[in-house]
Regions:
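A short beta-loop-alpha structural element at the N-terminal edge
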Residues: 2-22
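Conserved GNAT-fold acetyl-CoA-binding loop/helix
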Residues: 9-12, 23-47
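A short helix-loop-beta-strand connector motif used in the catalytic cores of GNAT acetyltransferases and
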Residues: 46-58, 67, 88
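A short, internal acetyl-CoA/4′-phosphopantetheine-binding micro-motif in the GNAT/acyltransferase core
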Residues: 90-100, 127-128
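Conserved acetyl-CoA-binding loop-helix of GNAT-fold acetyltransferases
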Residues: 94, 100-113, 136, 140
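Conserved GNAT acetyl-CoA-binding A-motif
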Residues: 115-127
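Conserved active-site alpha-helix within GNAT-family acetyltransferase domains
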Residues: 129-147
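C-terminal "cap" of GNAT-fold acetyltransferases
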Residues: 151-206
Length: 214
């Protein structure tokens, strides 16, 4: 197998190629009817989502794009990250033939280096409610479940995770209560398939979420 190089995305790798890789890598999930936000975004939308402060890492076998991951940097606005410099890992994908070679670890080394440069205080991630394995992995890595939500452009519920790099400022009990409240209100608001039960009920749940800040 030709040598694989991991690097910051060069200009000659287009954002449309990143989009096509995400589609190819997540083909099985798509066939199962699992809609993922990263696979519904166009190349231009991916570029705009990451913004100027984001960083896209790629794995190249010759001139072929075989893997990618990205990190988005922002200032937090929620109860768990307000005013903090936040990094969110996103859009990770590796073609099946190249999995198991440690490419994700290599790409993550570059994203971790970038996060240090940006003085990141909090790392965030999300995964599908039913992805029990990933939820366990994130928990073992020190992430806490802070929010249950219906993600945009997805047909399933997701769980949002946070890891405070400078020490967690909240008690486990407080965090669990916030998460449980967001889950209960979301389940009241939406039925199976993430379908709103009624417009009136949805508005009430949205107002309650804002009122109790979840």
């Amino acid at each position: 197998m030709e040598d694989i190089k991991v690097m910051i995305k060069p200009d000659w790798v287009s954002w449309d190629e990143i989009h096509e890789l995400l589609l190819a890598a997540h083909k099985k999930n798509i066939e199962k009817g699992v809609v993922m936000n990263t696979t519904t975004m166009t190349g231009e939308e991916i570029k705009n989502y990451l913004g100027e402060s984001g960083r896209c890492i790629v794995a190249l076998c010759g001139n072929e794009l075989v893997g990618t991951t990205s990190v988005k940097i922002a200032i937090g606005k929620s109860w768990f990250d307000k005013g903090k410099t936040v990094a969110k890992g996103t859009m990770s994908a590796i073609l099946k033939h190249y999995q198991g070679l440690g490419l994700l670890e290599e790409m993550n080394e570059l994203t971790n280096q970038y996060m240090k440069e940006k003085s990141v205080q909090i790392i965030e991630a999300d995964t599908a409610e039913d992805n029990v394995m990933m939820r366990k992995i994130l928990a073992k890595k020190g992430f806490k479940e802070v929010r249950f939500f219906p993600a945009k452009n997805q047909n399933h519920f997701s769980v949002y995770f946070v890891k405070w790099l400078e020490g967690c400022p909240f008690s486990d009990r407080f965090i669990q209560r916030k998460f449980n409240l967001s889950k209960v209100l979301t389940k009241i608001q939406y039925g199976p398939g993430k379908v709103e039960r009624s417009h009136f009920l949805s508005r009430i749940c949205q107002c309650l979420k804002k009122l109790i800040n979840v």
